[in-house]
């Protein structure tokens, strides 16, 4: 039995469909190390203790409830599992991050909120941001002080990003952006 479950080199695009997998590239729950199991347990405990008891209040969109849950998740390090330590994250590997997603996955709409925060709001900055952007945004997103949100769907284009009409134009003084357009909803917008 392996002492550490780790993923092989990253696949590109849909390569997993056409590439043959070697048995040593496959891992099962029996291969997870103690730390990975502990983190997974922390996630399932978080959902059981913090999310599920108030699920009806979440479903009724009680103001401030979802942001407070994201704050609690940030306090426990759950918003920064795959974020490098230099930005305040835990710096864990892909397998551990996947276990966190599985552990939080039973949290109904909370699972969507945390996935949008990390997968749409934080990770693109980590992967594609400038060093200045990473330093400015990632630490506060990792703690939950700032919330990652996402607004795609528009009345006349649905969720077709290429048909979106909303624009962002830099102000004449270069200090902020002026947004112009409509969105049907914004994930984590409240």
Spans of features found by a protein language model:
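Intrinsic disorder at enzyme termini
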Residues: 1-35
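Short alpha-helical functional segments enriched in proximate histidine and acidic residues
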Residues: 46-57, 148-149
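Short secondary-structure junction/hinge motifs that connect adjacent elements
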Residues: 54-75
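Glycine-rich, Trp-frequent "lid" loop and neighboring beta-strands that shape
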Residues: 89-90, 132-190
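Internal helix-loop-helix
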Residues: 12, 75-144, 188-189
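Buried hydrophobic positions in well-ordered alpha/beta secondary-structure cores of metabolic enzymes
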Residues: 36, 47, 77, 84, ...
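Alpha-helix capping/hinge segments and adjacent helical runs
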Residues: 2-14, 41, 49, 77, ...
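Mature N-terminal segment immediately following signal peptide/propeptide cleavage
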Residues: 30-51
């Amino acid at each position: 039995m392996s002492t550490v479950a780790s993923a092989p080199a990253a696949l590109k695009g849909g390569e997993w469909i056409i590439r043959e997998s070697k048995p040593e590239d496959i891992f099962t729950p029996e291969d997870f190390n103690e730390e990975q199991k502990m983190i997974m347990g922390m996630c399932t405990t978080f959902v059981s203790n913090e999310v599920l008891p108030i699920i009806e209040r979440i479903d009724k969109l009680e103001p401030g409830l979802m942001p407070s849950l994201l704050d609690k998740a940030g306090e426990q390090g759950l918003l920064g599992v795959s974020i490098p330590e230099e930005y305040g994250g835990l710096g864990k590997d892909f397998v551990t991050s996947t276990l966190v997603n599985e552990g939080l996955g039973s949290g109904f709409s909370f699972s969507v909120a945390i996935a949008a925060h990390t997968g749409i709001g934080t990770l693109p900055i980590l992967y594609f941001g400038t060093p200045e952007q990473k330093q400015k945004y990632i630490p506060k997103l990792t703690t939950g002080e700032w919330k990652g949100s996402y607004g795609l769907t528009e009345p006349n284009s649905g969720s077709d990003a290429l048909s979106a009409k909303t624009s962002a134009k830099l102000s004449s003084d270069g200090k902020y952006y002026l947004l112009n357009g409509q969105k049907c909803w914004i994930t984590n917008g409240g």
